[in-house]
Amino acid sequence: MTLLEQYIDCMQKGDCVALADLFTDHGVIHDSSTIKAGMDTLHLEGKMAIEMMFHHKFGFNGGPFPISGIRYFDERIVWYFITYNGKVVPVMATLSEMEDGKIKRLNIYPL
């Protein structure tokens, strides 16, 4: 599986540990799609921050956020629908930087 396929798989399973392991030690996830659901932009730096935040996000959500309509354009870009608090948000995730087979920076934008 590509890094993005693994990312989507971890998000669908709610596996915060495996999700964090996809990133470099100082990897970044920047997600502004959450604005469309009335939440603040999510900007996390480092594997530990990613694991801890998603542990809490999956916990408070009662499990993983539903993801559907997944369309991969290449190894760096995927579009999908994610549901936050009952609101379906179309998004694009882009692998901006990779290093040693890990994600160095992942940007997620609303469509």
PLM ranges: what are they?
Residues Y7, L19-A20, G27, G46, ...:
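Hydrophobic pocket/interface hotspot
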Residues G14-V17, P66-S68:
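Intrinsically disordered, low-complexity boundary segments flanking structured domains
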Residues Q6-D9, D40, A93:
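Short, flexible active-site loop motifs that bind/organize anionic cofactors or intermediates
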Residues L3, A49, K87:
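Soluble or luminal CAZymes and related metallo-dependent hydrolases
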